[in-house]
Amino acid sequence: MLDIIIAVIIDWIIGDPYWFPHPVIYIGKLIKMLEKLGRRFFKQDKWLLVFGGFIVIIVSSISFLIPFIILQGVKKFQVIYHVINIFFLWTVLAAKSLHKEGKKVYTALEKKDIEDARLKLSYIVGRQTEGLSKKEIIRADVETIAENSSDGIIAPLLFAMLGGAPLAMMYKGINTMDSMLGYMNFKYRYIGFFPAKIDDLFNFIPARVTGIIMCLVSPIIGGNIFYSIKIMLRDRKNHKSPNCAYPEAAAAAASGIMLGGTNIYFGEVVEKPTIGEEKNELSDFHITKTIILMYSSEILFIIIYVIIICFLGKH
C-alpha cells in the first residue's frame, strides 16, 4: 500500500522526465519491431490477424515477467525490493505528464498562438490537428485528459492494487499496444485487431470506475454528482470504444460542456456521437477544470483503496 502511495507522490512531483529511459519506450520499440517482422513475413490479412494475437501474447508476457522476475530476485533484500517496486509503479502512472502536456495546449491558447496549440495537441492525440479551431482544440485536449485519467492513472493503479507492479506493467504493455496498433483503419484493422480487443477487455472495469469516481468528485469543479451520473449513463455508448465514453461523459457533465463529434484520423473522417450537454461554451478554463478533476479522482481512488485495506486488515 505504501509503495503505491509513494509512487503516486513521485509521479506528482517529477512525472516522466524526457531524458529518462522510460520502460514504455522499450515496450514501444518491441511492438514496433514485432509489427515490422509481421509485415515482412505475412502479406495476407488472415495471417496479419493471427500475428496480431502473437504480438499480444509476447508483449503482455514480457511486460509482466521482467518486473516479476526482478522483484522475486531481490525479495530477500526488502529495501532494494521496495525501491524497485516503487520505480515500476511510478513508471506506469501519468498524472503529471497528462497535466504538463495538457497545460502546454492551454498556455499556447492563452498566448493566442493557435498554431502552437495545434502542434502541442498533436503530441498527445491521434487525430489530425491541422486546421482545428480553438474550440476543437479545447475539446480534444479535454477529451484526452479525461480518457487518459482512466488509461494513465486509475487503470494502472487498479492493476497495481490487484497484482502489484508486474500486473500494472502488463497493463501498460497492453495499453501501449493499443495506442500503437489498435486503429480500425485500413493499415491496422488486421494486425491491430487483437491488441485493440485485449485493451478493451482490460479497460472495461477501470473506465467505469473512473467515470463513477469523476462523478463523485465533480462538485469540486462546480458539477453535480447526480447530474454527472445521469449524463454518464445516458452517453456511455456514444463512442466507438466500449470504454472511453465513461470518463469523457463524466468529465463533460462535471463541466457542463459537450464533447465528441467529427474528427480526422490518418486522413480518414470519423463521425462520433456527441457526449454531454452544452450548458457552457468551451473555454480555456475547461482544460484546467479537467486537470483538477483528474487529480481529484486519483486522490479519491487512493483514499478508497486505503480505507478498504485498513478495513480488511482489521478483519
UniProtKB/Swiss-Prot annotation:
Belongs to the CobD/CbiB family. It is a multi-pass membrane protein. The gene is cobD. One of its GO terms (molecular function) is threonine-phosphate decarboxylase activity. Keywords: Cell membrane, Cobalamin biosynthesis, Membrane, Transmembrane, Transmembrane helix. InterPro entries: Cobalamin_biosynth_CobD/CbiB. The keyword Transmembrane applies. Its main location: membrane. Pathway: Cofactor biosynthesis; adenosylcobalamin biosynthesis. NCBIfam families: cobal_cbiB. This is Cobalamin biosynthesis protein CobD. The keyword DNA repair does not apply. Coiled coil: none annotated. GO terms for biological process: cobalamin biosynthetic process. GO terms for cellular component: plasma membrane. It is found in: Cell membrane. The chain crosses the membrane at residues 1-21, 50-70, 79-99, 151-171, 209-229, 250-270, 291-311. Converts cobyric acid to cobinamide by the addition of aminopropanol on the F carboxylic group.
